Amino acid sequence: MFGTAHKISTSTIWLAVLVSAVGLGWPERHQPVLYADDGDWDSRHIAPFVTTPDEVVTRMLELAEIEKGDVLYDLGSGDGRIVVAAAKRYGIKAVGFEIDPVLVKDSREIVKQAGLERLVEIREQDIRTVYFSPATVVTMYLYPGANLRLRPVLMRDLKPGSRVISHDFGMGSWKPDRVARFKDSADLSRTIYRWRIAEPPRR
């Protein structure tokens, strides 16, 4: 999911859609919609749907350094490709949160066809209402404004050692512990950030 809390040109969004629709077998009929929330976190709709290319999904999961027993939450899970990939490749439980009922239905069908119903769950839920404590890995493709609003919640809810992975956008003054920059197969520059939840300071 690609959230927008700031303005972005329509041409940029359409370019992103055209170059990122590379996952064979995934529904591509959903067109991006720019919701006019203008940074309003109370808006029901935060993000238009733009697929994350499979090669970027792979790099995001690699940067997460997933281990046995991890639980992955994907915010704005769209067509479900991140949660499906996590379950397939690493055998972990993965939960996608998506507010669009059509995408929820489609991604649940993909999960069923992949035989991953025991590992993958798609919840029709607003990401602002998610309780993150069960997760050890959180992935997102949201705009900086949404990232910044989620930051204190993630830092509050997640256990020490949990990883937060963001495609393209950072979290302000919260410095990532790792950053991966690369060119994808369409020669577009990609950046993936990782933050690790630190142990609370000793008193």
Model-derived features with residue positions:
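Bacterial N-terminal signal peptides that target proteins for export
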Residues: 2-16
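Class I SAM-dependent transferase core
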Residues: 26-67
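S-adenosyl-L-methionine
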Residues: 100-134
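C-terminal substrate-binding/active-site "lid" region of AdoMet-derived donor-dependent transferases
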Residues: 145-203
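Glycine-rich SAM-binding Motif I of class I
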Residues: 80-84
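Conserved SAM-binding motif I beta-strand of class I
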Residues: 93-98
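A short SAM/SAH-binding and catalytic strip from SAM-dependent methyltransferases
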Residues: 133-149
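Conserved class I S-adenosyl-L-methionine
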Residues: 69-78
